[in-house]
């Protein structure tokens, strides 16, 4: 078990309306200092399909995709004890200052990528924000029961239901 501190800056603009939250960056994401960096993680391809866009390949393209659709991206946790990338191993979770992030934008909806991030958000952050979260299926390769197309369909349905960006 390793003590991990979140060091990746959130992707956000003052126009962001929907905040997408993971739990804590994986070792590969921490190594590359960018979100969902593990090559088997399907977040970026699923989000691009959901938004009817080509899959971004560079960090700059990924940031542009998020901002173009008035989204924001961060993680629930600032620090925790964790084994590898196993969300189920998390101990001593400390949340990021999500209320302060929300205050600098137009965020009015929160999406969590998986049940662990949703559980931690609901317990540690919701009491301050009062914004309930919607749970997206985990994009992790460990969620093998869902094909990429299924993930994209769920992401699209949820984002379209929440966002004025599609109006």
Question: What are the language-model segments listed below?
Answer:
Residues 2-17, 39, 84-99, 122-167:
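C-terminal capping/extension of enzyme domains
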Residues 17-23:
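Short, hydrophobic/glycine-enriched beta-strand segments
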Residues 25-28, 78, 117, 140:
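Short, glycine/serine-rich, charged loops/turns that create anion-binding
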Residues 28-89:
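Short, surface-exposed acidic-centric catalytic microdomains
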Residues 41, 117-118:
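Alpha-helix N-cap/helix-start and coil->helix boundary motif
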Residues 45-49, 100, 104, 123:
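Residue-level signal for well-ordered alpha-helical scaffold segments within enzymatic catalytic domains
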Residues 68-116:
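Internal catalytic-core helix/loop-beta-alpha segment
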